[in-house]
Amino acid sequence: MEERLSTTSSYPSHPGRSVEEDHNTLLASSSISSIIRGTRGHLNNFIESVGNWLVPSSSGRDDDAVSLDSCQSVYSPVRHHINSGTGGGILMEPSSIHVPENYYSVTIGEAQMVVLKRYQNLRLIGSGAQGIVCSAFDTVRNEQVAIKKLSRPFQNVTHAKRAYRELKLMSLVNHKNIIGILNCFTPQKKLDEFNDLYIVMELMDANLCQVIQMDLDHERLSYLLYQMLCGIRHLHSAGIIHRDLKPSNIVVRSDCTLKILDFGLARTAIEAFMMTPYVVTRYYRAPEVILGMGYKENVDVWSIGCIFGELIRGRVLFPGGDHIDQWTRIIEQLGTPDRSFLERLQPTVRNYVENRPRYQATPFEVLFSDNMFPMTADSSRLTGAQARDLLSRMLVIDPERRISVDDALRHPYVNVWFDEIEVYAPPPLPYDHNMDVEQNVDSWREHIFRELTDYARTHDIYS
């Protein structure tokens, strides 16, 4: 557990991570050449060859597809041989369902996809309980894309509401550090037949589950963190809290561009104080969420701090075995909070916390010792001490004392990248908060179908 994991090991730092939690992995099969920041001249010696930096080795065979049910499968691939009778890793066969004009049907593994004809050469790159993700070539845009099919989106109210949120929020946001929607469609033309939802997105090269296994220099660590903060600030500017930040929901390209995805659990700041604590994958769950205090925007700052620390350590910071153990893991390292924090807890929760063993905080110089950081190049303006200082401000149990996104962006460890166009990008279009009232599955189905119909009317989804 204490060692930095190799790319051939399993992922013991993520026990119990569910299939549903990690179905969004987007992993392209193409090779990676280099990580290039672009035209900024803030740092010297940043552009270098990193051909083997980002993507694990692959046989590259078209008839092999990796099942990405969890982060573990990235490092210990389970290969599923897919019938390649037609080439390209897919099996085309007559469909038992009606296939409308401009669509075609393909079977990928055990899943049937009915997609627009503009998307060719589908390959399975991710699968999970809530859906599958395929890469495809968009013959209209002349580029590779990712197509996500949501499995059983109307199985229950929770799935339906999450599907609506994901589709709606993706269509509203417009920021370089948030995954963009390129198209969305359903092959069903009538509401009473509507069951399948497809979302077309940008295809990325890896997620942070893989990047965590790499040895990163300060420039890459800093730039990845800067982009996470920019993307989250964009959501917060519209009053949207992501709530489910984790390495598998953050993806990167070979040029080091980072994007945040999966908005199925996103909530408005207004709602936050009425929300259940069971949001966010456990390891990245903020103390105020664990203790049922309600939360505000900087709940996402805690999650980003956990991810940042994981990038440095190479393993999960607080790998709790259950809800209670998660709190214990946090205070074992950061110490039991003071009385001003405890007084804000509900009486029953406060009584429980006060009766737990008390812990003294371990200094951040010990939690993140110098040998965990890359050596600082003579030409670099970034240091391990700066990174450690920022972590100490993000991983604060009391949310009232935790650093804000805006202040984190001004911190010396990330402000070398500061660009007002990126940081202060126009906020997303407003989200209709009235949609968050309780509704049944049929109502959510109708709302999603209307969204798809409106999208098709205002966009040329075919060509």
From Swiss-Prot:
Cite the Protein kinase domain residue spans from the record: 119-412
Compartments, record wording: Cytoplasm; Perikaryon; Cell projection, Axon
| Tissue specificity | Expressed in most neurons, including nerve ring, head ganglions, dorsal and ventral nerve cords and tail ganglions. The Thr-276/Tyr-278 phosphorylated form is present in the nerve ring upon heat exposure.
- Disruption phenotype annotation: RNAi-mediated knockdown prevents Mn(2+)-induced dopaminergic CEP neuron degeneration. RNAi-mediated knockdown targeted to neurons results in increased total time in sleep bouts.
SMART domains linked to this entry: S_TKc (SM00220)
The record ties this protein, via InterPro entries, to: Kinase-like_dom_sf (IPR011009), MAP_kinase (IPR050117), MAP_kinase_CS (IPR003527), MAPK_JNK (IPR008351), Prot_kinase_dom (IPR000719), Ser/Thr_kinase_AS (IPR008271)
Residue ranges annotated as motif TXY: 276-278
Give residue spans, biased composition: Polar residues. Answer: 1-12
Q: Which UniProt keywords apply?
A: ATP-binding, Cell projection, Cytoplasm, Kinase, Magnesium, Metal-binding, Nucleotide-binding, Phosphoprotein, Serine/threonine-protein kinase, Transferase
Q: Which domain of life is it from?
A: Eukaryota
User: Where Phosphothreonine occurs, residue numbers?
Assistant: 276
* List of residues that carry Phosphotyrosine: 278
Record GO biological process: determination of adult lifespan; hyperosmotic response; JNK cascade; MAPK cascade; negative regulation of axon regeneration; negative regulation of cellular response to manganese ion; response to heat; sleep
Q: Where is this region: Disordered?
A: 1-23
A single MF term (Gene Ontology): protein kinase activity
The EC number on file is 2.7.11.24
The entry's active site is 244 (proton acceptor)
Q: Which cofactor does it need?
A: Mg(2+)
Q: Per the record, GO CC terms?
A: axon; cytoplasm; neuronal cell body; nucleus; perikaryon
**Protein task:** Serine/threonine-protein kinase which responds to activation by environmental stress by phosphorylating a number of transcription factors such as daf-16, and thus regulates transcriptional activity. By phosphorylating daf-16, plays a role in daf-16 nuclear translocation in intestinal cells in response to environmental stresses such as heat and oxidative stresses. Downstream of jkk-1, may coordinate locomotion via type-D GABAergic motoneurons and regulates synaptic vesicle transport in conjunction with unc-16.
Record text on subunit structure and interactions: Binds to the scaffolding protein, unc-16. Unc-16 also binds other components of the JNK signaling pathway. Interacts with daf-16.
UniProt protein name: Stress-activated protein kinase jnk-1
Q: Which organism is it from?
A: Caenorhabditis elegans
